[in-house]
């Protein structure tokens, strides 16, 4: 890190022992197995500026607090940080409302995929750090399990709101790249999975406030997506005369089978992919239901 990011300040705290500077601070050319497994850059340098030395007599038990951080706001006591995090986990389990060990374990596991995105000021889903950030398809598929089944309805609203803001040419982003660059839209199914996520959101919540949120924030975007898919948008996505959606052409890979190596398309699926059209049918059903007086007649959504 210090070799590439000279301005980063690394802070190290310990409540015991002696901090001893290392003579050799870098171990270069280390191969990282996880990166190698995902065909990422697998070589890195290990920075070890200090060693912490403390006496430990035979039969002695000790708890040592060590904190290493690059954050501006930090807690020097690792035990206090751990206690705060455990209290947060307890609150998440209580909110989910399960009284089953496996379900509680999954509730906490789901939390690891959710993060606060500074650029939007809202929560988001990270598909797989450090390699993958926000992916539209993955987010919409996982939204039910990560947020709705765990009672995190506000986080679900945040996620739906974020992707609604970035609808472009009637398309939900495929992914938000690192470093804050513009979203990529090369997918036909992320927009369709968005309808599925919206439907599940209302299925789990269903209060007047939630219907009002969908009416004001989400429904206009759903209509925009439907119109774009019907009349045609980017990446050769359009509705044909039989009512089915055509997607993709040339080197474009717009389904989940999106492997491309140079000019070689591993799994070309141009035409009318079956799952895209199943999701298209679902999208039409969700939109039709929202256009009718479902549950709350005073919240009937306009169809024009």
Which ranges hold each PLM region?
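Acidic/polar, glycine-enriched structural segments that form the non-catalytic walls/loops
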Residues: 1-132, 208-212, 223-231, 291
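Active-site-adjacent bridging/hinge elements
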Residues: 31-38, 109-123, 163-173, 250-262
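Conserved small/polar residues in nucleotide/adenosyl-binding loops
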Residues: 297-303
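Active-site neighborhood of glycoside hydrolase catalytic domains
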Residues: 283-294
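Acidic/Ser/Thr-rich, low-complexity mid-to-C-terminal regulatory regions of eukaryotic proteins
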Residues: 254-279, 285
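Aromatic-rich carbohydrate-recognition surfaces in CAZymes
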Residues: 133, 137-139, 146-249, 253, ...
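Active-site-adjacent structural elements in folded domains
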Residues: 49, 122-131, 176-181, 263-274
């Amino acid at each position: 890190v210090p070799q590439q990011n000279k301005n980063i300040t690394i802070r190290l705290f310990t409540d015991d022992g002696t901090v001893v500077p290392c003579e050799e601070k870098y171990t270069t050319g280390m191969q990282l197995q996880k990166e190698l497994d995902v065909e990422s850059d697998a070589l890195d340098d290990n920075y070890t500026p200090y060693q912490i030395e403390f006496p430990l007599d035979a039969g002695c038990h000790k708890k040592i607090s060590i904190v290493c951080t690059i954050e501006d706001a930090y807690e020097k006591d690792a035990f206090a940080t751990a206690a705060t995090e455990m209290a947060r986990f307890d609150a998440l389990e209580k909110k989910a409302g399960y009284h089953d060990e496996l379900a509680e374990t999954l509730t906490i596991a789901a939390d690891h995929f959710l993060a606060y995105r500074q650029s939007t000021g809202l929560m988001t889903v990270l598909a797989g750090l450090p390699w993958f950030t926000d992916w539209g398809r993955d987010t919409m598929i996982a939204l039910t399990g990560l947020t709705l089944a765990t009672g995190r309805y506000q986080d679900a609203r945040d996620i739906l709101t974020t992707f609604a803001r970035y609808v472009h040419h009637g398309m939900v982003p495929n992914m938000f790249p690192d470093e804050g660059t513009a979203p990529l839209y090369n997918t036909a199914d992320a927009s369709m999975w968005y309808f599925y996520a919206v439907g599940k959101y209302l299925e789990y919540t269903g209060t007047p406030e939630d219907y009002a949120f969908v009416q004001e924030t989400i429904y206009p975007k759903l209509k925009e997506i439907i119109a774009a898919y019907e009349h045609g948008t980017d990446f050769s996505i359009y509705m044909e005369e039989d009512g089915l959606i055509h997607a993709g052409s040339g080197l474009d890979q717009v389904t989940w089978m999106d492997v491309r190596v140079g000019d070689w398309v591993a799994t070309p699926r141009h035409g009318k992919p079956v799952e895209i059209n199943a999701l298209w049918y679902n999208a039409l059903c969700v939109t039709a239901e929202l256009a009718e007086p479902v549950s709350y007649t005073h919240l009937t959504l306009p169809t024009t």
